[in-house]
Amino acid sequence: MASNDKGLEEIPEGQIESNYDEITDSFDSMELKPELLRGIYAYGFERPSAIQQRAILPIIKGNDVIAQAQSGTGKTATFSISALQKLDPNVKGCQALILAPTRELAQQIQKVVVAIGDFMNIECHACIGGTNVREDMKALQEGPQVVVGTPGRVQDMIQRRVLRTDNLKMFILDEADEMLSRGFTEQIYDIFQLLPQSTQVVLLSATMPQDVLEVTTKFMRDPVRILVKKQELTLEGIKQFYIAVEKEEWKLDTLSDLYETVTITQAVIFCNTRRKVDWLTDKLTARDFTVSAMHGDMEQAQRDVIMKEFRSGSSRVLIATDLLARGIDVQQVSLVINYDLPANRENYIHRIGRGGRFGRKGVAINFVTADDVRMMREIEQFYSTQIEEMPMNVADLI
């Protein structure tokens, strides 16, 4: 960790310049602990994704690392594998601290760490708001080697001296742009002040606005910078279609017709507002479709139940807002429907990058009114992709 103020002006707005281009194209050649390697393969990974090929080794070597990459590229596994490689399972106490912007994402990261570290005898605790403080304190006192959490609760636990940082080796900020844009700047700066000077810092972010760059300049020492460009992100394997809908109010019938045509194993339907999510859920339920809904207004416990039902397959269709696009990671989703096109093009990949990550096939269907055509063209241009009119035989493709 470092404190300096130079170097900020060198970086073009919104994007970092890579200063590292070594690629390691297999997990076997990363010299990982055998029990970690076993966990990686057991989790279902075969070969590293673009970001994993570039970022895992410099992190393991102890460099501060800034990685710019979108969701759906394998970021979580990148820092999970790196942290697990550097941990000493025999030492109790937090050795890797991971911050995430939302509770969902923190819990998802915890699941990945636990799954990949399955053969390593390590503990990972999710330290998040909306849970019982006493239970949190009890879990932390047992000395889990990895703690993943949201900034407010983590800061609180460090200040109470329940989350000890004496053994801390690595501090990881995931989706840094999201954390700062949600107003966690002060907590994050406070956490930095409470950590040992020698802590290695790893920062991951989809975009690089000024406030993220300031964090990197203030708190990172000669960081390795890795940019995974858009074209390395995968819309590959995802068939993208649009259905032209003349009027907004006809979308509901269009969706019902689609339901009739297609056997949906699992689908996520995205709307742009919480109100629309509730409205659509009511309408579909009234038409005897079984759907669940999830948005930011809901209590945490309620969201957990919905997510659990969806992951286990007992609920087949989830209607959600963009807020949760980054926190939903359901491997078996075969279909994503954009009932509303996203309000900004960056969110398009967060939404549909779900359906076919890492070569899993998926289908995305966009409902497009006359007002949406321009946005759809922008999305096509931005991702150098084609969104074609939905064919009659769409059922065969899903």
Swiss-Prot record:
Main localization of the protein described in the UniProt heading: cytoplasm
Enzyme Commission number: 3.6.4.13
UniProt-recorded Gene Ontology molecular function terms: ATP binding; ATP hydrolysis activity; RNA binding; RNA helicase activity; translation initiation factor activity
Domain annotation Helicase ATP-binding: ranges: 56-226
Domain Helicase C-terminal: 237-398
Motif (DEAD box): 174-177
One Pfam family it belongs to: Helicase_C
UniProt keywords, alphabetically: ATP-binding, Cytoplasm, Helicase, Hydrolase, Initiation factor, Nucleotide-binding, Protein biosynthesis, RNA-binding
Cellular compartments annotated: Cytoplasm
Reported function: ATP-dependent RNA helicase which is a subunit of the eIF4F complex involved in cap recognition and is required for mRNA binding to ribosome. In the current model of translation initiation, eIF4A unwinds RNA secondary structures in the 5'-UTR of mRNAs which is necessary to allow efficient binding of the small ribosomal subunit, and subsequent scanning for the initiator codon.
Record text about domains: The Q motif is unique to and characteristic of the DEAD box family of RNA helicases and controls ATP binding and hydrolysis.
Quaternary data: Component of the eIF4F complex, which composition varies with external and internal environmental conditions. It is composed of at least eIF4A, eIF4E and eIF4G.
Protein's UniProt name: ATP-dependent RNA helicase eIF4A
Taxonomy of the source species: Eukaryota, Fungi, Dikarya, Ascomycota, Pezizomycotina
